[in-house]
């Protein structure tokens, strides 16, 4: 917020970015990250993206209410039950987006 330019190492150190890659490897790194995100429960990922989009457009109390609503939807989802079953059975989850 100071307008001061920072380098990649400092951005990583302060948590502004979660990874620094060598020049020319950014597309492959982004593809790997996208695959990792896509492997998660689609309903949870979609709601998280929606909350991020809404976050800067609503006040804190509205955002917290929306987050609570999203959590209640997710906790009742088939994907939540599948995640718990997969953990108990020590296998990868098979999420369906329901």
Where does each model-flagged region fall?
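Crotonase-fold acyl-CoA enzyme core
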Residues: 1-45, 68-69, 76-77, 81-85, ...
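Helix-loop "lid/cap" segments that line or gate small-molecule binding pockets
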Residues: 51, 55, 70-75
């Amino acid at each position: 917020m100071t307008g001061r330019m920072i380098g990649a190492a400092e951005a990583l150190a302060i948590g502004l970015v979660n990874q620094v890659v060598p020049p020319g490897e950014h597309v492959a790194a982004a593809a790997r990250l996208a695959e990792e995100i896509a492997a998660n429960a689609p309903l949870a990922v979609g709601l998280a993206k929606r909350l991020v989009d809404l976050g800067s457009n609503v006040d804190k109390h509205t955002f917290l209410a929306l987050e609570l609503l999203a959590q209640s939807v997710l906790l009742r989802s088939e994907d939540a039950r599948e995640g718990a079953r997969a953990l108990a059975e020590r296998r990868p989850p098979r999420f369906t987006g329901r």
